[in-house]
């Protein structure tokens, strides 16, 4: 009798574990790297002196806008850290936080100025992406303006 109860309890536990609803999202960058995350938030610099941020978007209950942001990010080319350059965040900057269970990675979008050498917009990814640690994302589009437009509509 005890064996049956333990067996049924075990079956119910397996069933509940299988039914657990964890929705993850995937960004497949144009260069083939794949990044999985659970939620995404967008922040702006609220106070430049104190370097505080304010959240302007969260992917929770905002699936349509999240899909639009992902569709912009998948166009980015992932390159090594050598393409990044120092920049100071200001009120025009965006921070995209990608949340997983145990960690958070961030894409820093400092300015909307094309690089003279590559003629592309450079954004810094802080975290591990593929086999690279803290790579640079290159884009033909001004993602800061486009993401702000998506968030504001």
Predicted regions and their residues:
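Bacterial N-terminal signal peptides that target proteins for export
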Residues: 1-7
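C-terminal motif of bacterial Sec signal peptides marking the signal peptidase cleavage site
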Residues: 15-18
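Function-determining sites in protein domains
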Residues: 20-153
């Amino acid at each position: 009798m005890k064996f049956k109860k333990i067996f049924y309890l075990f079956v119910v536990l397996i069933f509940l574990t299988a039914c657990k609803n964890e929705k993850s999202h995937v960004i497949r960058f144009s260069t083939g790297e794949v990044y999985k995350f659970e939620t995404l938030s967008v922040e702006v610099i609220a106070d430049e002196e104190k370097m505080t941020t304010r959240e302007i978007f969260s992917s929770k209950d905002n699936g349509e806008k999240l899909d639009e942001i992902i569709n912009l990010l998948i166009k980015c080319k992932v390159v090594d850290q050598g393409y990044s350059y120092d920049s100071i965040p200001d009120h025009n900057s965006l921070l995209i936080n990608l949340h997983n269970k145990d960690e958070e990675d961030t894409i820093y979008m400092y300015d909307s100025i094309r690089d003279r050498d590559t003629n592309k917009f450079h954004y810094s990814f802080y975290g591990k992406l593929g086999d690279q640690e803290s790579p640079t994302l290159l884009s033909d589009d001004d993602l800061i303006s486009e993401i702000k437009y998506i968030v504001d509509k």
